[in-house]
Amino acid sequence: MTIYEKALEVQPFVQDCRRTIHRWPELGMEEFRTTDFICEKLDEMGIPYRRLEPTGCIAEIKGNQSGKIVALRADIDALQMNEINDLPFRSERPGYMHGCGHDTHTAMLLGAAKVLNTMREEINGTVRLIFQPSEENGLGSQVVADQGGMEGVSACFGEHVFGGTGEKVGVVHYKKGGLFPSADTFWIHVHGIGCHGAMPDMGVDATVCAAAIVMNLQSIASREISPLEPVVVTVGSLHSGTAYNICSGEAEMTGTVRTFSKEHRKTFPDRLRRIVENTARAYRCTAEVEYGCGSSALINDPYVTEIARKAAEKILPDSSLLVEGGGSMGAEDFSLYTEYVPCTFFTIGCGEETFNHNEHFVVDESIFPSGVALHVQFAIDYLNDQATNT
């Protein structure tokens, strides 16, 4: 029986796991019921694990032959949004939804665990299963790393479902090199002097200053960085003023900066402060900038990606489903693992119409066997490669 056939065999199990998790979505660091469910399934399979604090868990399947450790990762948290669809297993928690597919990631990794548990004689080493909490706020991978999740690991693999791409369901994307950029956050506070809207000369309008700052920040990407290098500077929120006839004395903004370049990333705090402070001065205001570093860029290791690509070729039912490319300017905290070991991260098309983070988001469950089989085939192939070449 092929690995894909084994994945088809556990499809009812994976589907049931996914639907159970989907009904009870939990936010990052609050996935207590989800963690309990994962541990319950691991207990049923006889797979040892340890719980993370406060949520998540790490399990291990040891092969009959000794060797290196390869990690497979799934995120388990949900989003704070209402689900709007007619699924019989839709969210039972108003205001919470698995709108990014993490329920499917968790279920597919459980399915992979079920398959791998029957293949110990073919595992030349150990497969570590990481059920990671709190991806959405970028904190979960650090929790895993801080609690020893990367200790002894030689390589790590992850996968993510994506909808709304317009491509055929089940298309698997791989890419060597940069897949997702670093994602940092900034906060800007502008101080002016409030006054009556009919007498703007009597004050210092923080709203006008804030608007100028928003526009001037775009020159970082358009005039300070090569057009051949993708950079995004976005002001996502701007709050200023309390009434239609008052010139505001205060304005606050938040935003994000994204890049694949470590060198550029180091310069962004100073670039922002220079533009913000000088623009504020030009408008007779003052301003402060706070800058916070988030996820680093996710750069797929070429060697590990090639092993995963060949694994995908073996398991996909249709060769046209494997496509080179993909990626976006979105962020993914899987990137932290790349700072510890060589990693690769693949994406799977799960629906043509609805995007992730949408209240109508739906995953086509026919992709589950591919996701399960890709985990399994990669783990076995990587460990075999290491056993042969080291």
Language-model features: locations:
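Conserved hydrophobic/aromatic beta-strand scaffold that supports enzyme active sites
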Residues: G56-E60, W187, F345
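Hydrophobic face of alpha-helices
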Residues: Q11-V14, T35-C39, L109, T207, ...
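Histidine/acidic-residue-rich, glycine-tolerant segments that coordinate divalent metal ions
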Residues: L79-M81, N85-M97, T104, L109, ...
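Divalent metal-coordination and catalytic microenvironments
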Residues: I21, A59, L72, H102, ...
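Acidic/His- and Gly-rich active-site-bordering loop/insert found
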Residues: M1-H98, D103, A107-I123
